[in-house]
């Protein structure tokens, strides 16, 4: 049994450690500030991953929630809740699960629609949680970066990777792939670095 949100806690703790090591941020002198950063609750269930260099400077600023932040926060919470509770859960219970539980009872077209339905379910579930987290953070006076950018509009796998779970893909790129050497040492090393990055990223995601 693992605590809820342990993967995002791990990502954020590593982000702080690496950013300090790279001298991109100064070490925190307050244990309370560090505890606040790693335990800030809106995103701990399903993201987005919040980097130390993006969040910690906000701790040091006076708390302020503008009318625009409040309105956008409420909108994102309602939109995220609609995605999760209405679209994702409805598709899952009334369509996807029925087909996946007994695929032989349905035609090929219906099974194909089940796959498309599952893709929509996963997107609405995950992005719904992210939208709610971003909205709650805004109501508390903090800004999170966009985590999903219409990924199913992508024209290629590369573009999809840049649009889906942006905080995770950029974290893996900046803290793993580039640290391993990226594409600077020939094709073999590039492909090896990609494989290692995807493997370790998958392991870290599994502990969520």
Locations of regions flagged by a protein language model:
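Membrane-embedded transmembrane alpha-helical bundles that form the catalytic cores
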Residues: 1-208
